[in-house]
Regions:
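Small-residue-enriched alpha-helical segments and adjacent helix-cap loops
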Residues: 1-93, 105-107, 114, 118, ...
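Noncatalytic linker/hinge segments flanking ATPase motor cores
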Residues: 25-29, 67, 99-103, 127-138
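Short glycine/threonine-rich loop-to-helix capping motif typified by GTGT followed
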Residues: 28-30, 70, 138-153
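Flexible, glycine/charged-enriched surface loops at secondary-structure junctions
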Residues: 51-55, 122-144, 154-170
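Active-site beta-loop-alpha junctions enriched in small/polar residues
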Residues: 97, 137-142, 183-187
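Internal alpha/beta scaffold segment
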Residues: 97-131
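Rossmann-like S-adenosyl-L-methionine
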Residues: 151-163, 183, 187-190
Length: 190
């Protein structure tokens, strides 16, 4: 816990399922570095006891785009960086990948944490209305559609262009010198 890898109480640890584009701050093709928003969401989730009711494996995805994109990562609630005439925004989606999620609209990066928190609270409220509470966003949408999530105040109409996300290199097709294989824990300054 001193290293920041876990939190007290243990029940809060279960809600910390946030996937964020790795090294987006170093990626020249990324539209947004989502790490600050992911850290802020993490703090909101662990500081509010209501989120301990989120089911295990309920996942939030922050996709900044670029080389370290998470366009193909499946998430319950996702924020994908898009380029708009007004500047970079997050496209908010439910239950899926960038291509398959139910798109709700766009929001400013400064609003994304509040929007995702509100969506998670709506999920927690709506799942209890089912005979068997939904464990994933897909189950809730299949049961009652995405209408409970419509009309959030901080969302504008969906639009914009996602950052290019090149496919991962195929094994054996990578130029020599572009990949470094190092055993876990062996890369250091000594």
């Amino acid at each position: 816990m001193d290293a920041g890898l876990a939190v007290e109480p243990a029940a809060s640890e279960a809600v910390r399922n946030i996937q964020c584009s790795a090294a987006a701050d170093l990626d020249p093709q990324a539209l947004i570095d989502p790490a600050p928003q992911a850290r802020a969401l993490d703090q909101r989730l662990i500081s509010d006891d209501r989120f301990r009711a989120l089911p295990p494996k309920f996942r939030f995805v922050f996709n900044g785009g670029g080389l370290t994109h998470l366009a193909d990562a499946d998430g319950d609630i996702r924020a994908d960086a898009v380029s708009t005439p007004e500047g970079p925004r997050y496209r908010i989606g439910l239950a899926g990948t960038s291509a398959t999620a139910h798109s709700l609209g766009n929001c400013k990066p400064s609003q994304v944490v509040d929007v995702l928190v509100e969506l998670a609270l709506i999920f927690l409220e709506e799942r209890q209305r089912l005979i068997t509470p939904a464990r994933r966003m897909r189950q809730l949408i299949d049961a009652c559609g995405s209408s409970p999530f419509a009309g959030l105040r901080d969302l504008s109409r969906p639009g914009g262009v996602m950052a290019d996300h090149p496919p991962a290199p195929e094994p054996g097709r990578t130029r020599a010198g572009t990949v470094l294989g190092v055993a876990l824990g062996c890369l250091g300054t000594n």
